[in-house]
Design a protein with these regions (language model features):
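Juxtamembrane intracellular "pre-TM" segments in multi-pass secondary transporters
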Residues: 1-7, 193-229
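Short amphipathic helix-loop junctions that connect adjacent transmembrane helices
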Residues: 22-46, 243-260
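A membrane-interface helix-boundary motif in multi-pass transporters
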Residues: 42-46, 161-177, 369-388
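Structural signature of the two symmetry-related core transmembrane helices
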Residues: 79-94, 289-304
Length: 409
């Protein structure tokens, strides 16, 4: 392996940003913003949170081809990683200034923080081929993934006593400090920028041209098009469940902040378990069948959530959702690889990542608007099941998913 220190620092960055993913994006801050800052009596908190997630992810998705070009062609990866990380860290620290009724200020800070987080990942991911030989990249990526889970768990455990004491401002400061401190090794040790002479605007334009070229290649593969459309649909449902599950549990079922953290930890453990248990069936049954099975599970979870009233039942349901989460992520990636021409892995996975980011745009808006219009989160969570059902039937029409992709006629 090229440089173990660089590999470790790269993995540690995943550990760092997982504090944002867990505490800010998934568990504690969504409930705080929706119920304390906005007030969620008539679904307005859901509406504003859904808008914030959708708008920020739409911005990141639309800018990703340009950011990818800047990462690949300008030679300024580390500089932009630092800029986007600083943007996120500072915005999260500013959460501590929010007070009840500061809806717009909170909305703007969420936009900035999420753009900083998701935009920075474009440059973070671009370092992987530079720090690791191809034969080790899968392992290094998995190490980052595993260390990231550890970061999620540790940051939630650190947040727990603060949340229990109602010291939310200090919770946001803790997350920003956690992110900043553990991202420093990556900022210091990752390879230095090697400017190419191409301007930032020039490299962004080249990234867009490259993206258009890849999209043209994809348009010539009808099975891949259908899979990506299916993935866009069901992944939107998955992302919506992730960003609204804590708000649903707190508002509809009366979960306390401590219970929400426990709920998230259960989901993390079951997600890892699901990915591990289904690793062999993905190969034996084919990734398409495993994804279809996962979507049936996700649809059942969303429909069941509509009827659930007891906290214990929701804990059990969340365990099944976690199993489906780990499985659908692993199987979807395995299925996508079957459509990639040899030697085109990097550019095709860039498109896969873009579709993944785009799949957090519509679902949160749908949940927020239905919740506010019906003054209930139950019809909103029921509507999310439609994303899984649509993805299921779209995937059924895809010719592939076994040992090899079968081409029609």
């Amino acid at each position: 392996m090229k440089n173990l220190r660089q590999v470790f620092s790269w993995c540690l960055f995943d550990f760092a940003n997982s504090s944002y993913s867990a505490v800010i994006a998934a568990v504690v801050f969504p409930v705080y913003y929706a119920t304390t800052i906005v007030g969620n009596d008539v679904g307005q908190g859901d509406l504003w949170w859904g808008r914030a997630i959708s708008f920020s992810m739409a911005f990141v998705a639309l800018s990703s081809p340009f950011l990818g070009g800047m990462a690949d062609y300008s030679g300024r990866r580390k500089r932009f990683l630092l800029i986007y990380t600083t943007l996120c860290v500072c915005a999260v620290a500013c959460f501590s200034l929010l007070r009840e009724g500061m809806v717009i200020e909170g909305f703007i800070l969420i936009l900035v923080a999420n753009i900083g987080m998701e935009g920075g990942l474009v440059f973070y991911n671009a370092f992987l081929p530079e720090i690791s030989e191809k034969e080790y990249q899968g392992r290094v990526s998995a190490w980052g993934f595993g260390i990231g889970y550890a970061g999620s768990i540790l940051s939630l455990l650190l947040a727990l006593p603060l949340v229990r004491a109602g010291r939310f401002a200090e919770t946001w400061i803790m997350v920003s400090f956690f992110f900043a401190v553990f991202s420093l090794p990556a900022i210091i040790l990752l390879p230095r920028d090697n400017k190419t002479g191409l301007s930032v605007l020039g490299s962004a334009a080249k990234g867009w041209t490259y993206f258009v070229s890849v999209m043209r290649q994809i348009s010539g593969n009808p099975e891949l098009r259908k899979f990506l459309l299916s993935y866009l649909a069901y992944e939107d449902g998955v992302n919506t469940v992730i960003v609204f599950s804590s708000i649903f549990a707190a508002t509809t079922l009366g979960f306390s902040p401590q219970e929400l953290i426990g709920l998230y930890l259960i989901v993390q453990v079951t997600a890892l378990t699901g990915a591990f248990i289904m690793a062999k069936p993905i190969d034996l049954w084919g990734p398409k069948n495993v994804v279809l099975l996962s979507l049936l599970l996700w649809s059942s979870v969303a429909v069941s959530a509509y009827f659930i009233a007891a906290k214990m039942h929701f804990f059990i349901l969340a365990s099944f959702a976690g199993l489906g989460l780990g499985t659908v992520q692993a199987a979807s990636r395995a299925l996508f690889t079957q459509f990639i021409p040899e030697g085109k892995e990097s550019e095709y996975f860039g498109t896969y990542s873009l579709v993944g980011k785009s799949s957090a745009v519509f679902g949160p808006l749908v949940f927020g608007y239905i919740s506010s219009n019906f003054n209930s989160q139950r019809p909103a969570i029921l509507a999310v099941s439609l994303f899984f059902i649509a993805g299921f039937f779209l995937l059924l029409s895809v010719n592939g998913g076994g040992p090899n992709v079968r081409k029609k006629g």
